[in-house]
Amino acid sequence: EEYKGVYVFAQQVDNELSGIAFELLGKAKELAADLSTDVTAVLIGSGVKGLVDQLAEYGADKVIVVDDPELKEYRTEPYAHALASVINEYKPEIVLVGATAIGRDLGPRVSARVATGLTADCTVLEIGDFPINPVPNQEQKHNQLLMTRPAFGGNTIATIACPDNRPQMATVRPGVMQKIDP
């Protein structure tokens, strides 16, 4: 399997990490443990190397830093290019992005560039089999990211998988996942 690892887009604004980065790292740690893999934070910005230790404290095993003066302020095109380039080079199995104003802009553009699906506004993320219940004449795949989100106006929930494409990408609203204490 050439795709490996759980990656988190570590959002920062004005060289300060957003709370969602820590929440996603907490969830990524759980998912990575289930997959026997590691957690990588992707930090994009200008002069952001000072944030690396904080990401490590909150669960990142590795941090990939894309540091360039052009990336000082969030702009769609340069950030999408940076994150898509990291995904294409390192081939993560899972990529988590916060469903913030930045993440909602960035996530869909990046998933389109790397030709994979994106499940937005997930409330539950877990590793499991898909289809969840075996179906005759259909292979049940193991170790899939099962992404649960509200559907149809929030009256029901849907659990979505992306069995045939990698990475599996999800956005998660702030406040849904728990950060781990360093």
Regions found by a protein language model. Give the residues of each.
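N-terminal glycine-rich FAD/FM-binding segment characteristic of electron-transfer flavoproteins
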Residues: 1-182
